[in-house]
Regions:
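DNA major-groove recognition helix of helix-turn-helix/homeodomain DNA-binding modules
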Residues: 45-65
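Short alpha-helical "recognition helix" segments of helix-turn-helix
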Residues: 21-23
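Helix-turn-helix DNA-binding elements, focusing on the entry/boundary residues of the two helices
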Residues: 8, 19, 48
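A short, Lys/Arg-rich alpha-helix, primarily the initiator
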Residues: 1-15, 25, 52
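Short, charged recognition helix plus adjacent turn
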Residues: 61-78
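Recognition helix of helix-turn-helix/homeodomain-like DNA-binding domains
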Residues: 27-43
């Protein structure tokens, strides 16, 4: 799950969503988002769904991209 923060940062930048906006919709402090996107902490597995749900409210395409990228990064390399 170490790549979740990298993926979140990419999605936020691609879709023009601020860390503050995501934090507000999630009902958490912006510092949590900051730690995730700067790889200082990994979001808990339950937070992945909360991130998806918040992104869905802000921009459904961003939510789809986040989950698709996260699932793709979870597949073992062959």
């Amino acid at each position: 799950m170490a790549k979740a923060g990298i993926i979140l940062k990419q999605v936020l930048e691609t879709y023009g969503i601020s860390q503050s906006d995501l934090a507000k919709v999630m009902g958490i402090q912006r510092g949590n988002i900051h730690r995730w996107v700067n790889e200082l902490a990994d979001p808990a597995s339950t937070a992945i769904i909360e991130i998806r749900d918040a992104l869905q409210k802000i921009n459904p395409a961003a939510a789809r991209a986040f989950i698709e990228l996260w699932l793709d990064s979870s597949e073992p390399e062959t």
